[in-house]
From Swiss-Prot:
Species assigned in the record: Nitrosococcus oceani (strain ATCC 19707 / BCRC 17464 / JCM 30415 / NCIMB 11848 / C-107)
GO biological process: isopentenyl diphosphate biosynthetic process, methylerythritol 4-phosphate pathway involved in terpenoid biosynthetic process
Gene Ontology molecular-function annotations: 1-deoxy-D-xylulose-5-phosphate reductoisomerase activity; manganese ion binding; NADPH binding
Gene coding for it: dxr
Amino-acid positions noted as binding 1-deoxy-D-xylulose 5-phosphate in the UniProt annotation, renumbered to this chain: 125, 151-152, 182, 205, 218, 223-224, 227
EC class name: oxidoreductase
InterPro entries, alphabetized: DXP_reductoisomerase, DXP_reductoisomerase_C, DXP_reductoisomerase_N, DXPR_C, DXPR_C_sf, NAD(P)-bd_dom_sf
Residues bound to Mn(2+): 150, 152, 227
UniProt cofactor(s): Mg(2+); Mn(2+)
Gene3D superfamilies per record: 1.10.1740.10, NAD(P)-binding Rossmann-like Domain
Catalytic activity: 2-C-methyl-D-erythritol 4-phosphate + NADP(+) = 1-deoxy-D-xylulose 5-phosphate + NADPH + H(+)
Keyword Oxidoreductase found: yes
Protein name (database record): 1-deoxy-D-xylulose 5-phosphate reductoisomerase
Similarity comment: family membership: Belongs to the DXR family.
Function per UniProt: Catalyzes the NADPH-dependent rearrangement and reduction of 1-deoxy-D-xylulose-5-phosphate (DXP) to 2-C-methyl-D-erythritol 4-phosphate (MEP).
Length: 393
């Protein structure tokens, strides 16, 4: 039995992972679950999957869960705090780690899993955005297996040669990577109307079912910008080798353009259970519960270039990548502050890129050669961004 620990089991990726795991009880065992404070939801997950351990980041939520579980399944160990997350992913009973915590909060436990040599199903792109060099070094040194779960990077993984994955793109005969993006809910909205976009509108993605933070990132296309940075680290690519293509149908999840003129694409319905099942079963494949792709119903696939006036966050991400050091960390921190401020209705949708650009101009990046350096840049950028939100609000 393969022991699977899920970081962020109550989020959309975590729930999709459990849906896939439930189909194979003879092959996978849910070793540990974690959440921030969603007690009712994780309680139901505990009743169904009976993990050995559960971690609630919030101590009060952990105590509530402990009191609810003890009369029913007293054998489940409930703990709290960020350090407990590192404990479950490094446990000898954990073979695979689904890294699905959203944002910078997922960095430390995911890095711990890499250092422990686990198979990591990486849905937390911020781990690579913030500490790409450190993270990839940890994977290499420990012999960990790193499988991308973002649909785009999983598609690229499937379209790349199976041999020599560690080689740079030109050694694999790859000319460029084509990352597809839906364009989110506002790809055709008049620019003059974007000031008045509400959080609920921004979270209504036309194709994917996602959490609120990543839905806003999709609407601004910062999500695609972060994915560009992630792809650079995963595939040893330069920024100039990655092109973003708007593809509203979200059927082609990404493409690889080879030097001989061949372009390989991975297609499928927009359902995260596909890359999750691929990561769990690799190098094999297994049924995931995803609906059969009906090309006749889709009819046509369309593509266009992204408009950087409409999506300035994408340009900011490329600029941060080119600048190097902890600039990507600063970008991510400012974005997390900006998105939360927008969701809290403290700033406008169009102020998200303005706050990020403002923060990038005021926080000096350093060399990203240690975890303390990365965390320091993250903390400084958050403080600077939060102070500016207070001035605007």
């Amino acid at each position: 039995m393969i022991g699977v620990s899920i970081l962020g089991s109550t989020g959309s990726i975590g729930m999709s992972t459990l849906d896939v795991l439930a189909r194979y009880p003879e092959r996978y065992r849910v070793q540990a679950l974690s959440a921030n404070r969603s007690v009712a939801q994780i309680y139901q997950q505990c009743l169904q999957f009976r993990p050995s351990q559960v971690v609630m980041v919030d101590p009060d939520a952990a105590e509530q869960l402990r009191q609810r579980l003890h009369p029913v399944v007293p054998e489940i160990e409930v703990s709290s705090g960020s350090e407990a997350l590192e404990t479950i992913v490094t446990s000898p009973d954990t073979d695979y780690v689904m890294a699905a915590i959203v944002g910078a909060a997922g960095l430390l436990p995911t890095l711990a899993a890499a250092r422990a040599g686990k198979r990591i199903l990486l849905a937390n792109k911020e781990s690579l955005v913030m500490s790409g060099q450190l993270f990839m070094s940890a994977v290499s040194e420990s012999g960990a297996e790193l499988l991308p779960i973002d649909s785009e990077h999983n598609a690229l993984w499937q379209c790349m040669p199976a041999e020599g994955r560690e080689l740079p793109l030109h050694r694999k005969g790859v000319r460029r990577i084509l990352l597809t993006a839906s364009g989110g809910p506002f790809r055709e909205r008049a620019l003059s109307e974007l000031d008045n976009v509400t959080p609920d509108e921004a979270c209504a993605h036309p194709n994917w079912s996602m959490g609120r933070k990543i839905s806003v990132d999709s609407a601004t296309m910062m999500n695609k910008g972060l994915e560009v940075i992630e792809a650079c680290w995963l595939f040893d690519a330069a920024a100039c080798q990655i092109e973003v293509v708007l593809h509203p149908q979200s059927v082609i999840h990404s493409m690889v353009d080879y030097v001989d003129g061949s372009v390989l694409a991975q297609l499928g319905n927009p359902d995260m259970r596909t890359p999750i099942a691929y990561g769990l079963a690799w190098p094999e494949r297994m049924e995931s519960g995803v609906t059969l792709l009906d090309l006749f119903a889709i009819g046509q696939l369309t593509f266009c270039q992204p408009d950087l006036q409409r999506f300035p966050c994408l340009g900011l991400a490329y600029a941060a990548l080119e600048r190097g050091g902890t600039c990507s960390t600063i970008l991510n921190a400012a974005n997390e502050v900006a998105v939360q401020a927008f969701l809290d209705q403290r700033i406008q949708f169009t102020q998200i890129p303005k706050l990020i650009e403002w923060t990038l101009g005021r926080v000096t990046p350093t060399v990203a050669d240690s975890l303390p350096a990365v965390l320091e840049s993250d903390a400084v950028a958050r403080q600077v961004a939060k102070e500016q939100v207070e001035r605007w609000y």
